[in-house]
Amino acid sequence: MKLHVGSGSVYLEGYRNIDVPAPKVFLSERRPDLVERWKTTDDQYYAKHEDKTQDKLRKGPLDQEYVCDVYGDFSNLPAPAWSVDEILSRHVFEHLSFAEAHKALDQCDEVLKENGILRIDVPDSKATLELYRQTGDAFYERALLGPRRDDRGYHLSPYTRESLRAIVEEHGFVFVAEEPNIHFYPAFCLRFVKPGHRAPRDYVQLPAIPAGWKVLDIGPGEYPHPRADAYLDYDITKLTPLSERGKRTIRADIMGDVPQCENKEFDFVWMSHCMEHLKDPLAAARTISRIGKRGVMIVPSAWKEGLTNFEETGHLWQILPNPDEKAAPIFVRANGQVDRIRNIDVMKSMSRVFRSGPNRIAPSEQRSLRRWWYENEKELDVVYFWENRLDVRVME
């Protein structure tokens, strides 16, 4: 689910459009004619507007009827906790006091899923003020202070890129990028992410996979590799969604022979967070070596296991990096025992950082730890590239 908060005169397809109740703001279910009038897409945000010119905006926005899907605002977003993939807000935060902005960001953190996107678009107060100083044009005064046609028309909080980043990052979000300015006046839109577990493909530095290479993803799980030509798993439920999208799927146990695959059929084999679950990693390594020419194996480090509830993971092995960086990682049978980092109490149960509900830790600690995890996740895994043959060492 995607939320478009403060939708105003823009009805975005693919989003749940949210705005405050007002005399000329109607619900979409009651006014499908207004939906048709104002609907557009994110990449054509102002396509239905004739008033977005400097001369017309001098008099304020046109007095027309608008539409949204549900009434609401940032004080109480109409969405369950951890249910939202993206929140887009254009020219709303400047209408909030800084205290209200902090509450709004708390709400965003509450409803966004881990790795959810937050996009905030506001006027560029620094650049606008400079233009007003240079020209004296009242249009830039309006851009600074707001249209001031009613109580909600005032700009209460000016922002620069630095100040917006500071307030959003204070709530644990991670800055991703600045998006292109879609306005004809100074403004900026910053994109943030709510930290969480990421797909390893998003942080592991892979060598370039040449076009034309045939790629196999073993154990795709929640994050199937988009570059893969085929996906292998013993669990049919993990493969069904991929099969329905026309992907080649191979139901097989990688510890077996996998007769569906020919010798050295795949130019590159991607295997992330699978080997630690297997009873016989040596057998799996032999099969992978037979069907693949090269690849990467990603497994959690022993330190990472120590930060989480190891007993809940179903991992059968702890994996230690080999002192010789070019040599295979060492698999040590876990037997349910993992050395914990006991001197940092809050890290004994790192999985709670990514969990919603009454059992989660204090929000401030949750945010800081979640952000730390996100920014350092690549350091918490053992990444092993192999060529011709995948070797592993096993210590019982």
Model-predicted segments: where are they?
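Core dinuclear metal-dependent hydrolase active-site scaffold
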Residues: H4-G8, L206-A208, I218-P220, D235, ...
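Conserved SAM-binding loop
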Residues: L3-E130, L164, L190-P195, A211-K304
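Conserved alpha-helix/loop element of class I SAM-dependent methyltransferases that forms part
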Residues: R198-W213
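S-adenosyl-L-methionine-dependent methyltransferase catalytic module, highlighting the catalytic core
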Residues: G60-L62, S97-K113, I117-R198, P259, ...
